[in-house]
Amino acid sequence: MAGNSRFISSAQSGPHDDLAALVHRHLDHPFRKPILDYNRQAFSAALAARDAWNPGAPLVLDAGCGVGWSTLRLAERYPDHFVIGVDQSSDRISRGKPLSLPANAHFQRADLVAFWRLFDEAGVRLARHYVLYPNPWPKIG
């Protein structure tokens, strides 16, 4: 199958020379970026959608779901789980899909870093976590 994606290339030939020091620095200092209210509201809305469907349902997170095809497929694959598709782009999430949204699926616009932190803060454990479309140049913020 041919695609039109650009080839990913980098001048970096191996791990960064200071990788260990950078990791230790981040481990030694807490992440201080505040979680914005809209992310807290998005997190609450996602859990409320799960609770409305089945309060005890295991959770599947489709991180960076884009237009949501993977969220729909995951909901089909795990009919007894509640699948939350999260993406930062409301444009991508809102793009039309020929399939209807299953009852065990929910799309949410939110910042993924905040969403992950909110799962941890709330003590919520995921049954499955998918990152199917990784950005080769992730950015926080």
Predicted regions and their residues:
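Short beta-strand element of Class I
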Residues: 81-84
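A short SAM/SAH-binding and catalytic strip from SAM-dependent methyltransferases
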Residues: 127-141
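S-adenosyl-L-methionine
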Residues: 1-59, 70-72, 76, 99-122
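Conserved SAM/SAH-binding beta-strand->alpha-helix loop
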Residues: 89
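Conserved beta-strand/loop positions that form the S-adenosyl-L-methionine
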Residues: 63, 86
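Class I SAM-dependent methyltransferase "Motif I" SAM/SAH-binding loop
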Residues: 64-68
